[in-house]
UniProtKB/Swiss-Prot annotation:
Belongs to the OmpP1/FadL family. It is a multi-pass membrane protein. This is Long-chain fatty acid transport protein. It comes from Shigella flexneri. GO terms for molecular function: long-chain fatty acid transporting porin activity. The keyword Transport applies.
Length: 446
């Protein structure tokens, strides 16, 4: 793995999951901010106001609440992501269950001030990622451990103009932290072969270096990076109520700029730096600083909610994320030298969701939904630490109201991803993945 690839993953460390470490939407984006939303595949979230969690999606929904309302819960993610392939050295690249299970907690509060104004706060996550490979994995130079977390703190307010129009605005503070490790795997053998096939292989120095590379143990830590940082952004929403049974929403979440600082080290001998080899910059075990600016993409979403019958409603969403803003990563040292400059070339991506809700009685509500996540990662830029792919959702859930004040939500989703091929460094992989998501939230209106 090159130092470019290492810092690609370090950048993503600045955009990952709140006390969680999974990305189960397109790219490294997270949707899991409520359990009621999970049960309908997050369809119509900008226009539904059945609990306080919806306000984190559209702050204009604050005006739909006439009492202070609280919601807290978590979504449990149980992924099954497997990698297969064969290294040029002949070693197997098979690895099962590379994405660990994780919890994605959430907490929301909404309070009206008067008939026109209200405010809300939430703790969620919008980005997340985690993959883990064995320390002796043959492709350890591009696999290893990627443990990335973020927490999004949101404070928002809303204004009702009249019976039809409401507007909301929110401020977001994102805290991110990361730990990334890469191991030699069989890269030493491959590098030794590359040296011997180059002009350097005809010199005594080159031959000695090739022998050193060939002797590198597979569990040698060739790269280590950790760090943390804050980033800031904003979100806004508009709600239009045609009548009490039909409403529509437009929401926006801004691009977030995060200036990431991390500590980088490698146990490789510095002599490897003189040959332009496809390995991380060697530091001989010493630690140095690396700086990187990452722009997390903006997102637009259009949502609708129609109660077509006293007991039935349909809801739907179309989200558009400007992943094309994520075109390159450039890391520099303290002295300003370029540590890497890598073209990412992500493309804009969309998410479409459709669901329905059945209001059985005053106690029971049932919901279901389907969704499709379009992957923003071009085939040539896929990575086994971010094995992204198009994904299909199938969801169901229920709410039980104990009384007019307290209720509990339960949701479950099955997510299936298509099988994809990944070309990274000297390796060729195949990846397939699926996941089960289970969530529960408790809601209380004061």
């Amino acid at each position: 793995m090159s130092q470019k690839t290492l810092f690609t993953k370090s950048a993503l460390a600045v955009a990952v999951a709140l006390i969680s470490t999974q990305a189960w939407s397109a790219g490294f984006q997270l949707n899991e901010f409520s359990s009621s939303g999970l049960g309908r595949a997050y369809s119509g979230e900008g226009a539904i106001a059945d609990d306080a969690g919806n306000v984190s999606r559209n702050p204009a929904l604050i005006t739909m609440f006439d009492r202070p309302t609280f919601s807290a819960g978590a979504v449990y993610i149980d992924p099954d992501v497997n990698i297969s392939g064969t290294s040029p050295s002949g070693r197997s690249l098979k690895a099962d269950n590379i994405a660990p299970t994780a919890w994605v907690p959430n907490m929301h509060f909404v309070a009206p001030i008067n008939d026109q104004f209200g405010w809300g706060a939430s703790i969620t996550s919008n980005y997340g990622l985690a993959t883990e490979f064995n320390d002796t994995y043959a492709g350890g130079s591009v696999g290893g451990t990627t443990d990335l977390e973020t927490m999004n703190l949101n404070l928002s307010g809303a204004y009702r103009l009249n019976n039809a129009w409401s507007f909301g605005l929110g401020f977001n503070a994102i805290y991110a932290r990361a730990k990334i490790e890469r191991f030699a795997g069989d890269l030493g053998q491959l590098v030794a072969g590359q040296i011997m096939q180059s002009p350097a292989g005809q010199t005594p120095q080159g031959q000695a270096l090739a022998a050193t590379a060939n002797g590198i143990d597979s569990n040698t830590k060739i790269a280590h990076l950790n760090g943390n940082q804050w980033g800031f952004g904003w979100n806004a929403g508009i709600l239009y109520e045609l009548d009490k049974n039909n409403r529509y929403a437009l929401t926006y979440r801004s691009e977030v700029k995060i200036d990431f600082k991390g500590n980088y080290s490698s146990d490789l001998n510095r002599a490897f730096n003189n040959y332009g080899l496809p390995i991380p910059t060697a530091t001989g075990g010493a630690t140095q600083s690396g700086y990187l600016t990452l722009n997390l993409p903006e997102m637009w979403e259009v949502s609708g909610y129609n109660r077509v019958d006293p007991q039935w409603a349909i809801h739907y969403s179309l989200a558009y994320t400007s992943w094309s803003q994520f075109q390159q990563l450039k890391a520099t040292s303290t002295s300003g030298d370029t540590l890497f400059q890598k073209h990412e070339g992500f493309k804009d991506a969309y998410r479409i969701a459709l669901g329905t809700t059945y209001y059985y009685d005053d106690n029971w509500t049932f919901r279901t939904g389907i969704a499709f996540d379009d992957s923003p990662v071009p085939a040539q830029n896929r990575s086994i630490s971010i094995p992204d792919q198009d994904r299909f959702w199938l969801s169901a859930g229920t709410t039980y109201a104990f009384n007019k004040d307290a209720s509990v939500d339960v949701g479950v989703s099955y997510m299936h991803g298509q099988s994809v091929k990944i070309n990274e460094g000297p390796y060729q992989f195949e990846s397939e993945g699926k996941a089960w998501l289970f969530g529960t939230n408790f809601n209380y209106a004061f």
